[in-house]
């Protein structure tokens, strides 16, 4: 089994694929990170600094490795790459005569975020009312216009879609972004959900058996998707067939599981598990093989004490099998009464209907019975502690917000909130940034190109006002985003989608 170890302060990093997996092929790099195209006419209105020699001076750097922030640094960007990182403008040596020099005193530069649970859709509940009731079916409209802009505006320069309901749309959208015709991040396109029978989502194909799972993976791999995701009602046999076919093609597979437990999936060779430890069902009462429980993992999370034997045993199993875990804390924060409200800029991106649905959800949470509120709060704290314990044991934690939940988690804004919640979980700010940047790059096998601020890597960078290493909420103040050395204007991108998320 391939394994790469990277030593950084306080965190063990590794790159591997599940049992029996093939090496990540070099073609994956060219698919996810193709040669950059010049921004076209439709993209230029959102460009603040066209590519060219750019020098960022007097800036604080959080480099993505988990190490302490470094003050008064100079970063030279040229030809879409980080040409140099030095401790002063003088140390950078002679600058190109045509270089654009920015004095970024009072600002911090981070690596571009590598979002690992970053959907391109919105979940709509028809005729949702204040009591939380809606009419079937659940609908999943594609946000091909608004989502890529929201991600890029908030510093997400590479993302994994982590499940698709319109895979052809996602593939075509990626091609348009890569060609410079539409603004958006680099994209690892995940295939359609590999779901079993029983899903409430009418847009998902229910797998008939393991042969269907294998054929589905093969078909979409041939069409260009670069990852796969198993979903709640998939059986062990179907999951095993999907894993084997994905690995045969050098691709990875993750899962938001229910009918299959975390231990079972790890034994089958899965590469990643979504939603931290919030959806594991192994301790749910009455759990039967290949059957999703009514609890959907709530009982397991509530009963699994972070320092208890069940948690330690599970974490050891996942670490020993090199299974990554994706943290998606913002979507679970929605169930905690009194959680932080949407930031005004995020709220402004929602359609009136999405805004109403979000407020319904928030009010329902606040008005839940006291015992339910207490139970959810305790479960959320368990989830935070389990993710921290997983990393302490040597596990690879990656991150994404899961922008669902009636508009309660918004693309891009949710990625930033995820970093804040990782700090709440006990990580240092620099370590939280690492989880959201370099760790995702390592999982994708792209750490030689993205994920940290190092000379020679792609110039995917986020400039924020303030110092997130001391006040993590400063990470919300994104002022400039570089992708392949091109500086994008977050405010222009946000204005273009104002009131649009939830519509298109």
Over which residues does each language-model region extend?
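Active-site neighborhoods of metal-dependent hydrolases
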Residues: 216-229, 234, 279-425, 498-504
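Bacterial N-terminal signal peptides
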Residues: 7-18
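C-terminal cap of metal-dependent C-N hydrolases
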Residues: 458-501
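C-terminal helical cap
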Residues: 59-61, 373-375, 380-381, 385, ...
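Metal-associated gating/positioning segment near the N- to mid-region
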Residues: 108-181, 200, 205, 211, ...
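Histidine-centered divalent metal-coordination motifs
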Residues: 58, 107, 117-121, 256, ...
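Divalent metal-dependent hydrolysis catalytic cores, especially in the metallo-beta-lactamase
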Residues: 144-167, 185-192, 221-234, 252-254, ...
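Histidine-rich, glycine-flanked metal-binding segment
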Residues: 38-41, 46-48, 52, 61, ...
């Amino acid at each position: 089994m391939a394994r790469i170890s990277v030593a950084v302060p306080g965190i063990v990093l590794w790159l591997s694929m599940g049992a029996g997996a093939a090496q990540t092929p070099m073609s994956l790099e060219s698919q996810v990170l193709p040669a950059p195209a010049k921004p076209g006419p439709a993209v230029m209105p959102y460009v603040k600094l066209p590519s060219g020699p750019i020098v960022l001076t007097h800036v604080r750097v959080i480099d993505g490795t988990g190490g302490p922030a470094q003050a008064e640094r100079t970063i030279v960007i040229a030809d879409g790459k980080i040409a140099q990182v030095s401790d002063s403008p003088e140390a950078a040596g002679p600058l190109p005569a045509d270089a654009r020099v920015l004095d970024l005193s009072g600002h911090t530069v981070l690596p571009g975020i590598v979002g690992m649970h970053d959907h391109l859709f919105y979940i709509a509940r028809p005729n949702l009312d204040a009591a939380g009731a809606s009419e079937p079916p659940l609908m999943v409209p594609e946000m091909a216009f608004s989502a890529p802009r929201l991600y890029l505006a908030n510093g997400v320069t590479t993302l994994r879609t982590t499940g698709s309901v319109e895979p052809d749309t996602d593939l075509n959208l990626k091609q348009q972004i890569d060609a410079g015709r539409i603004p958006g991040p680099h994209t690892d396109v995940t295939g359609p959900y590999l779901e079993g029978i029983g899903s409430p989502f009418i847009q998902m194909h229910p797998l008939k058996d393991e042969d269907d799972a294998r054929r589905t993976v093969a078909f979409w791999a041939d069409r260009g998707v670069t990852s796969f995701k198993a979903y709640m009602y998939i059986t062990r046999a179907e999951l095993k067939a999907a894993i084997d076919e994905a690995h045969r093609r050098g691709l990875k597979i993750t899962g938001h599981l229910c009918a299959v437990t975390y231990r079972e999936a790890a034994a089958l060779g899965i590469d990643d598990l979504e939603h931290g430890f919030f959806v594991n069902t192994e301790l749910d009462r009455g759990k039967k093989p290949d059957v999703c429980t009514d609890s959907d993992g709530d009982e397991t999370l509530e009963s699994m004490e972070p320092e208890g034997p069940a948690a330690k045993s599970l974490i050891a199993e996942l670490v020993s099998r090199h299974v990554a875990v994706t943290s998606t804390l913002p979507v679970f924060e929605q169930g905690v009464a009194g959680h932080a409200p949407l930031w005004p800029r995020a709220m402004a991106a929602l359609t009136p209907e999405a805004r109403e649905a979000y407020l319904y959800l928030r009010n329902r949470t606040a008005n839940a019975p006291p015992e339910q509120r207490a139970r959810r709060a305790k479960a959320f704290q368990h989830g935070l502690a389990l993710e921290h314990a997983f990393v302490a044991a040597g596990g690879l934690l990656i991150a994404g917000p899961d922008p669902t939940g009636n508009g309660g988690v918004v693309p891009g804004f949710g990625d930033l909130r995820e970093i804040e919640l990782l700090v709440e979980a006990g990580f240092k700010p620099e370590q939280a940034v690492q989880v959201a940047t370099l760790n995702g790059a390592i999982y994708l096998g792209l750490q030689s190109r993205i994920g940290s601020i190092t000379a020679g890597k792609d110039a995917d960078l986020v400039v924020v006002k303030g110092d997130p290493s001391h006040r993590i909420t400063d990470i919300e103040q994104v002022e400039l985003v570089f992708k392949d050395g091109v500086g994008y204007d977050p405010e222009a991108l946000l204005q273009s989608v104002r009131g649009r998320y939830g519509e298109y």
